Amino acid sequence: MKNVWLALVGIVMAFSVTAAQFTDGKQYLTLDKPVTGEPQVLEFFSFYCPHCYQFEEVYQVPKAVKKALPEGTKMTRYHVEFLGPLGKQLTQAWAVAMALGVEEKITPLMFEGVQKTQTVQTPGDIRNVFIKAGISGEDYDAALNSFVVKSLVAQQQKAAEDLQLRGVPAMFVNGKYMIKNDGMDTSSMDNYVKQYADVVTFLLTQK
């Protein structure tokens, strides 16, 4: 019984120490005007954004955050349309990926086409990325023109506006907190990613 108690005390102390390391204004910001109705964990990104590429493909922060989330907590990712000549079309394409449930297939291919090979220059090129990912052109076209995708595009636009988004990558928790990307432990990539995920899970417990 004593060992069980000591173990519980250790867990509580460990959580307290971790929580004490996270400070409003350093690792996160509390929004002046919280937005209700937003996803519990919401990330904004753009396929045009070099930092988003590093965030996703090199550091793999979204993957780490998703893995660390408590059971039943969902992470949502929205594309922004204010970057690049095809920003609006890529936001529509991301809505298609969301509707078809192929976000993980599309993400690396689209980043590669937009930033590395620069082969995504037209709406047709965007469509070809989906075909490369195994989605038929017909399915892509049908989804692109669907009510579901139009609604998802509107959701992405409204969330960015309501949260007064100014740049990407950006992650919000419960429509109330924004993670400060520059407030994490930068002593190593692993430490940065772990602390980022820890801050998100910590904020999920805050009222």
Swiss-Prot record:
GO MF term set: protein disulfide isomerase activity; protein-disulfide reductase activity
GO BP: cellular response to antibiotic
Keywords for this protein: Disulfide bond, Periplasm, Redox-active center, Signal
Disulfide bonds: C49-C52
Entry annotated with the keyword Disulfide bond: yes
Gene3D superfamilies: Glutaredoxin
Record-level GO cellular component terms: outer membrane-bounded periplasmic space
Source taxon at top rank: Bacteria
Signal peptide: 1-19
Matching PROSITE patterns: THIOREDOXIN_1 (PS00194), THIOREDOXIN_2 (PS51352)
Subcellular locations according to the entry: Periplasm
Limits of the Thioredoxin domain: 20-149
Homology family: Belongs to the thioredoxin family. DsbA subfamily.
NCBIfam families reported for this sequence: PRK10954.1
Role this protein plays: Required for disulfide bond formation in some periplasmic proteins such as PhoA or OmpA. Acts by transferring its disulfide bond to other proteins and is reduced in the process. DsbA is reoxidized by DsbB. It is required for pilus biogenesis.
Designated name of the protein: Thiol:disulfide interchange protein DsbA
Species name: Yersinia pestis
High-level lineage: Bacteria, Pseudomonadati, Pseudomonadota, Gammaproteobacteria, Enterobacterales
Gene name of the encoded protein: dsbA
